[in-house]
């Protein structure tokens, strides 16, 4: 009974191994496929514009057909195909990285790293703030000087007005004094004239009597 079981066990094991071998997939794993091709878009120069030609921005990866796993399949051919696909993927990835590198270099504006770029931008921003603060201080000083000049002008106008009032008052006083002096002289002249008239009248009368 044991001798009969051994050949049966070997036969069952062979059948199972053949079924397992027939279900095994030795081909490469691919990304999501659409119509048998994998579409990957990139911008050759790294700068996307609306007028870029879509044909130049599209790469088509040829996908291999699913191959049945057979015991007598040429493994060297499979490996060569896998290496060809990997090589294409690497070349396409290199082009994508080149475009990304150009985009990054454009963003960095000639700097070697983002650190240097950020330090330069920070320095420029600090200088801009410093210049703005300096301009504000200068404007504040000019505003204060303008206020001081306005106060000086106001004080000068007030002083000139007061001086004019004082001068006018002095002129009026002097005019009044002169007027009073003239009045006194007029009265004196009137007295002298009346005195002379009296003397002339007396002399006339005396002369007529003679």
Swiss-Prot record:
Glycans are attached at residue 35. Residues 1-23 form the signal peptide. It holds the Pfam family Fibin. Its main location: endoplasmic reticulum. Residues 133-157 form a coiled coil. It is found in: Endoplasmic reticulum; Secreted; Golgi apparatus. GO terms for biological process: embryonic pectoral fin morphogenesis. The keyword Transmembrane does not apply. GO terms for cellular component: endoplasmic reticulum; extracellular region; Golgi apparatus. Keywords: Coiled coil, Developmental protein, Disulfide bond, Endoplasmic reticulum, Glycoprotein, Golgi apparatus, Secreted, Signal. InterPro entries: Fibin (IPR026772). Homodimer; disulfide-linked. Seems to also exist as monomers. Essential for the initiation of pectoral fin bud formation. Potentially acts downstream of retinoic acid and Wnt signaling and is required for tbx5 expression in the lateral plate mesoderm of presumptive pectoral fin bud regions. Belongs to the FIBIN family. PANTHER family: FIN BUD INITIATION FACTOR FIBIN (PTHR31185), FIN BUD INITIATION FACTOR HOMOLOG (PTHR31185:SF0). This is Fin bud initiation factor. It comes from Danio rerio (Zebrafish).
């Amino acid at each position: 009974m044991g001798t009969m079981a051994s050949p049966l066990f070997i036969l069952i094991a062979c059948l199972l191994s053949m079924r397992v071998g027939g279900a095994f997939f030795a081909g490469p794993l691919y990304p999501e496929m659409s119509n048998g091709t994998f579409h990957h878009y990139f911008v050759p120069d790294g700068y996307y514009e609306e007028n870029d030609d879509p044909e130049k921005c599209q790469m088509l990866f040829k996908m291999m057909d699913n191959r049945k796993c057979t015991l007598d399949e040429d493994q060297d051919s499979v490996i060569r195909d896998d290496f060809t696909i990997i090589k294409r993927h690497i070349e396409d990835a290199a082009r994508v990285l080149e475009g990304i590198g150009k985009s990054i270099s454009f963003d960095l504006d000639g700097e070697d790293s983002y650190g240097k770029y950020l330090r330069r931008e920070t320095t420029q921003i600090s200088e801009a703030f410093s210049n703005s603060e300096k301009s504000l201080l200068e404007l504040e000083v000019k505003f204060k000087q303008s206020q001081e000049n306005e106060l000086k002008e106001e004080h000068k106008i007030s002083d000139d007005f007061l001086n004019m009032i004082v001068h006018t008052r002095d002129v009026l006083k002097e005019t009044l004094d002169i007027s009073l002096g003239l009045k006194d002289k007029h009265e004196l002249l009137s007295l002298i004239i009346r005195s002379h008239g009296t003397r002339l009248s007396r002399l006339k009368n005396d002369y007529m009597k003679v």
